[in-house]
């Protein structure tokens, strides 16, 4: 069941004073970052990041290796909590609620904000059991409900026609591209509100990459999608908005077409034209 998505509590007028924060109406903001710094022990990885992630759009994070793209992405569902010594200063508001509030239910947060990693990671189970894994954890075991969820999620992930006759075969027998789409199906089966994709195509061949990119385009009508990519052509193809990061700082953030054709910062222009990075 999709929950009503509260948008209260966002101080949008104050955010507009920050250069990198999009001028968005309150109801169109999915994730608000009013100023986030992150540390691994004594090392600072993110420096006062401020941006708004638009609802039901695709936002790409680009930048050279080690610039903080994945660190920022993983902050949105607190995956960085799993790293020893990680410490956060600031806030991240998901539909107006600070996910770093003391006592936050992190398991529920990660259901609402699903994540797909660089390398496809299907479980050593059947295709069917991969898709229903999260539902079973929630205590949902009624066969009719699970069957409907499997069909819906696999169709949404553009995989149903390829696997509908072998749902009870091992997911490990799928191709890399099929496995990645299966992982996306597994993620959306629990009905998240946001999808985080950490270089989801870097291990895939060009044809599989195209299928995943087409899927991203289809899914944005229902989900807010944030993608980390080293491939600037991919960012230009799939995203509505793009953020360029460098050495843990947000250099520029805005409409993808504008950022690639008329960047406001020389540092951005140098990166997208291949002068460094």
UniProtKB/Swiss-Prot annotation:
Residues the record lists as binding ATP: 63-70
Top-rank taxon: Bacteria
Which keywords, in A-to-Z order, does the entry hold?
Answer: ATP-binding, Cell inner membrane, Cell membrane, Membrane, Nucleotide-binding, Phosphate transport, Translocase, Transport
Instruction: Please give the InterPro entries that the UniProt record associates with this protein.
Output: AAA+_ATPase, ABC_transporter-like_ATP-bd, ABC_transporter-like_CS, P-loop_NTPase, PstB-like
* Enzyme Commission (EC) number: 7.3.2.1
Could you tell me the membrane topology recorded for this protein?
Peripheral membrane protein
- Catalyzed reaction equations: phosphate(out) + ATP + H2O = ADP + 2 phosphate(in) + H(+)
- Family (UniProt): Belongs to the ABC transporter superfamily. Phosphate importer (TC 3.A.1.7) family.
Q: How does it assemble?
A: The complex is composed of two ATP-binding proteins (PstB), two transmembrane proteins (PstC and PstA) and a solute-binding protein (PstS).
Q: What is this protein called?
A: Phosphate import ATP-binding protein PstB 2
What is the organism field in this record?
Pseudomonas syringae pv. tomato (strain ATCC BAA-871 / DC3000)
Q: Gene encoding this polypeptide?
A: pstB2
């Amino acid at each position: 069941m999709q929950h009503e998505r509260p948008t209260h509590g966002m101080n949008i007028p104050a955010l507009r004073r920050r250069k990198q924060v999009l001028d968005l109406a309150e109801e169109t903001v999915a994730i608000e970052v009013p100023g986030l710094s992150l540390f691994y022990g004594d090392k600072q990885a993110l420096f006062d990041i401020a941006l708004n992630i638009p609802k039901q759009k695709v936002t790409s994070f680009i930048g050279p290796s080690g610039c903080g793209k994945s660190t920022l992405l993983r902050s949105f569902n607190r995956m960085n909590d799993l790293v020893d010594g990680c410490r956060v200063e600031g806030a991240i508001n998901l539909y107006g609620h600070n996910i770093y509030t003391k006592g936050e239910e992190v398991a529920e947060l990660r259901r609402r904000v699903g994540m797909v990693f660089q390398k496809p990671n299907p479980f050593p189970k059947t295709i069917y059991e991969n898709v229903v894994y999260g539902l079973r954890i929630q205590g949902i075991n009624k066969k009719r409900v699970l069957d409907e969820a499997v069909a819906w999620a696999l169709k949404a992930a553009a995989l149903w026609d390829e696997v509908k006759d072998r749902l009870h075969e091992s997911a490990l027998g799928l191709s890399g591209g099929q496995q990645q789409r299966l992982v996306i199906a597994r993620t959306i089966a629990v009905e998240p509100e946001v999808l985080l994709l950490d270089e989801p195509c870097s291990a895939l061949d060009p044809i599989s990459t195209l299928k995943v990119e087409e899927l991203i385009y289809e899914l944005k009508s229902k989900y807010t999608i944030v993608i980390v990519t080293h491939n600037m052509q991919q960012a230009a193809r799939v995203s509505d908005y793009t953020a360029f990061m460098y050495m843990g700082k947000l250099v520029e953030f805005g409409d993808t077409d504008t950022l690639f054709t008329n960047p406001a910062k020389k540092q951005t222009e140098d990166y997208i034209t291949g002068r460094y990075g």
